[in-house]
Amino acid sequence: MPLSSIHTLPLEKLRNNLSSEGYKAFHASQVFNWVYKLRQSNWDQMTNLSLDLRSYLKENLLATQLVKKREVFLEDQETVKFLWQLSDNMLVESVLIYSEGRRTVCVSSQVGCPARCAFCASGKNGLKRNLTAAEIFEQVYQIDLWLLERKEKVSH
């Protein structure tokens, strides 16, 4: 069975999951603090969690399910395209658009497209599947991490 993403779990459900495995409920808040406030997606870097808990998290939850395959600045230097590989090896793109005072992310919500427009590559092979909410969210999350390295953040 594929692992679930941390981004699919509400805090209360993570508390219940951890408690049922013998961990303290407050550990869920620590995990959420690492993931959503400190923007850490590597379980090993969550140093205030025990090694045992980090091992449990690695075995049972994905901290990230998108793998960045490519990032390309377009000629206008105001647009960056990201190519992501999903856990089923399908590929999707996201676009970061720089504009005056804004950092806007355009996300994919599907693999492929049913429209098959002649001018668009997305529909050439038809619609493969809809993305999960976690896969859609993680596109924004990952691009925000990319921007944070540059002392910026997503605004739209």
Task: Please state what every model-predicted region is.
Residues 90-94, 100-108, 112-156:
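Conserved Radical SAM active-site core
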Residues 1-103:
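Flexible, acidic/Gly-rich N-terminal and inter-domain linker regions that tether
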